[in-house]
Amino acid sequence: MPGSRVIESTSRTSRKVKLSLMGPAFIAAIGYIDPGNFATNIQSGAAYGYTLLWVVVWANLMAMLIQLLSAKLGIATGKNLAEHIRDRFPRPAVWAYWVQAEIIAMATDLAEFIGAAIGFKLLLGVSLLEGAILTAIATFLILMLQQRGQKPLEMVIGGLLLFVAAAYIVELVFSQPELSALAKGMAMPSLPTSDAVLLAAGVLGATIMPHVIYLHSSLTQHEGSHTRAERYSATKVDVAIAMTIAGFVNLAMMATAAAAFHFSGNQDIADLDKAYLTLEPLLGKAAAVIFGLSLVAAGLSSTVVGTLAGQVVMQGFVRFHIPLWVRRSVTMLPSFIVILSGMDPTRVLVLSQVVLSFGIALALVPLLSFTGNRELMGTMVNGKWVQRIGQLIVVLVVSLNMYLLIDTMSGI
């Protein structure tokens, strides 16, 4: 029938459009599986088994909404979050925003860079400094893809995300978690002790990444040849798929740690080195190697994304541009200083997350304000319920990060 052929052709064209527009959310999703997430999820699973899996589920749902709002801002207005702040805030506030955003980007990169270096160290038996040099070389090579446009970089970052997801499918097979207990942990909220509250705050509070909010609105702001409706429709699919994969990885990390460590009497696993060394005798060499490879993949991809985010905030806030290789060189200096000074890398990783917490409200509040502004967003303005849920997320995430900040600073 001619009519059915037209409908089939239209449907096929729509799928091709969606496919061509997918990618930005995969770059953003990398921020949710960085080495900081590895450390928090492993510690939570080792200490409390499957009990805190529900926190990962809810944190991921919140992150989905936040990333969708960020992407929608770029689509609806053709400007990213940093540019909107620049255009609407007083100049002193804009400069203050830029400085804090750069500090946040560097603090985030510190955790990601050192995480990848630890991965190389564990896999190859090299020193942490040699691991850092390998990380620097690898990130420079990945960033060179940016010269060929956004798509090749999206494909590589997306490939690394899928690799980490595949690695954790294998880890789940090795660790064989108890499915009924796993499902119960995902569905039933429980906080058995005050330490569990702190770990839950760590899982949830470290979920929303300020630099990725800035970056996602930039990745979707360029119009191309597609309509806003087509782009937003594709973006919803993009965010749903990418963030679901990131959520699965976080769930798998915690479930693997629960199955491998908690129920074997290793509840005190608190750092990445110990997790790797404990995995080998429990689950075999292959499981430990896969863990190391996934840590390297997550660290490399997230540190590249952090570099791109830093470029976006600089261009957006102060209209200043430097070559990516210069930015990469500058932002990895703190990591080398930490390594050369002999500081505990896991401790530095935790402290970097505290610094990051300062920037969360500063990114979320204007994002919610702009996407709830009908004059700015037109027909793509947030609905009443989306706005209320967004406000609730802001209050919750900021409160948890302040709680984490106070607790961490009191322990120093």
UniProtKB/Swiss-Prot annotation:
Q: Which residues form a coiled coil?
A: none
Extract the InterPro entries matched here. Answer: NRAMP_fam
The organism sits in which domain of life? Bacteria
Predominantly, its location class is membrane
Function according to Swiss-Prot or TrEMBL = H(+)-stimulated, divalent metal cation uptake system.
Location(s) in or outside the cell? Cell inner membrane
The question of whether Membrane is a record keyword is answered with yes
Pfam families associated with the record: Nramp
- Give any Gene Ontology cellular component: plasma membrane
Tell me, which GO biological process terms does this entry list?
Answer: iron ion transmembrane transport
Chain segments annotated as transmembrane: 19-39, 46-66, 98-118, 122-142, 155-175, 196-216, 241-261, 286-306, 348-368, 392-412
Q: Write down the membrane topology.
A: Multi-pass membrane protein
Under what name is this protein listed? Answer: Divalent metal cation transporter MntH
Q: Which UniProt keywords apply?
A: Cell inner membrane, Cell membrane, Ion transport, Membrane, Symport, Transmembrane, Transmembrane helix, Transport
- Keyword Cell membrane (UniProt): yes
HAMAP family with a match to the protein in the record: NRAMP (MF_00221)
Q: Please tell me the species this chain comes from.
A: Pectobacterium carotovorum subsp. carotovorum (strain PC1)
Q: Which family does it belong to?
A: Belongs to the NRAMP family.
According to the UniProt entry, its GO molecular function terms are: cadmium ion transmembrane transporter activity; manganese ion transmembrane transporter activity; metal ion binding; symporter activity
